Amino acid sequence: MNKTNFHTHNYRCEHAIGNVEDYVKVAIKEGYTELGISDHAPMPEYYENNRMKEEDLDRYLKEIEEAQEKYGDKIKIYKSLEIEYFPEFLEKYDKYRKKLDYLVLGLHAFRKPGDNTNYNAWKIKTGEDVLDYAKYMAEAIESGKFDYIAHPDLYVINYRNWDESCEKAAHIISEAAEKMDVPLEVNANGIRKSFERHPDWDRYMYPYKEFWEIVKQYNVRTIIGSDAHDFNRMEDREMEIAREFAREIGLNVIESIF
């Protein structure tokens, strides 16, 4: 098995620590063969906090290029960004993609039909919210702008009762991923958050078992993502738990998106 990770942050998003080289050094130490750096993309129009500033982007990409040059004989390093989906920004995604090796969809906000309000996925409270989130994610996937779907089961993070809406949502997302042949991520950071915030819970905030049992019914590739916000925890017990979680369900896990 080759160790890889394509979901990695750094200090520029203002809620992670470490620079690009810090993560690269850990990846090499842990025997990784590939590492994707994918910090939160600048979106000055929305959600200015918790993501890099527009003026930081060129330096961010340059830092990755410097790491590629310095460590390229030891590990393959890729340039990426994790970004929200807003249909009015399709040209922005194309602009970013020209500078990147791949683009990650991380859907933390969603919209309802006929409503341009940006709703927070962490505040999903109703079955209608769940379905709206899933339909919006499917729209994003089918836009063809994204190469990797981070934490697709995020909609259950605070909606704890798996019900018919959750099941339908999982089918909607899985169908879109299968149609576009885009991998869905089993996210290790959801396991970290579970242990830190809800140690008494009998399941993870995400990955959510019932969601992934539905994914398994489709011809969908899956990938394990660390979603590392701390280079000291990029390869930790939660990453191994995520790998075992995928093995137990029998998911079609890929090691690389290339």
In which residue ranges do the predicted regions lie?
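An N-terminally biased module of ancient metal coordination in phosphate/nucleic-acid-related enzymes
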Residues: M1-P87, K92-R97, N158-K168, I172, ...
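Short coil-to-beta-strand
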Residues: E30-I37, L100-L107, G144-K145
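Hydrophobic residues within beta-strands of alpha/beta enzymes
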Residues: L35-I37, L103, I149, L184, ...
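Hydrophobic alpha-helical segments and helix pairs
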Residues: S80-K123
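Structural alpha-beta junctions
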Residues: D101-Y102, A177-V182, A246-I254
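Domain-core and long-helix interface of multi-subunit machines
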Residues: V104-F110, N116-Y218, A228
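Long, positively charged, glycine-interspersed low-complexity recognition regions
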Residues: H198, R203-Y208, E213, Y218-F258
